[in-house]
């Protein structure tokens, strides 16, 4: 029956049509991990989560791990907060060496 489809069925079909980035669901994950480890001393995902919380962004350790492993998309305001918390420019997270 056409009308018996659930919203989750429609959402799954839509998710399959949304193209993934060239390296997964985001293109900044590797740089987030790199920036986190370049800080002296390196900070943990939990510590980064705490810095983000102070900026008003709620990303727990698991969400940060998913971002770093390209298994989670990053919203624009999360990207800006990640750059601020890590002390890097947003362009750097995209791979720009500036």
Feature roles, as predicted:
Residues 48, 64, 82-83, 93:
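Hydrophobic packing within well-folded, soluble alpha/beta domains
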Residues 41-67:
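Short alpha-helical DNA-recognition segment
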Residues 52, 68, 78, 94-97:
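DNA major-groove recognition helix of helix-turn-helix
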Residues 69-84:
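Short, basic-rich loop-to-helix N-cap that marks the start of a DNA-contacting helix
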Residues 2-43, 91:
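A short, Lys/Arg-rich alpha-helix, primarily the initiator
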Residues 31, 44, 49, 60, ...:
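Residues that mark the N-terminal boundary/hinge immediately upstream of a DNA-recognition element
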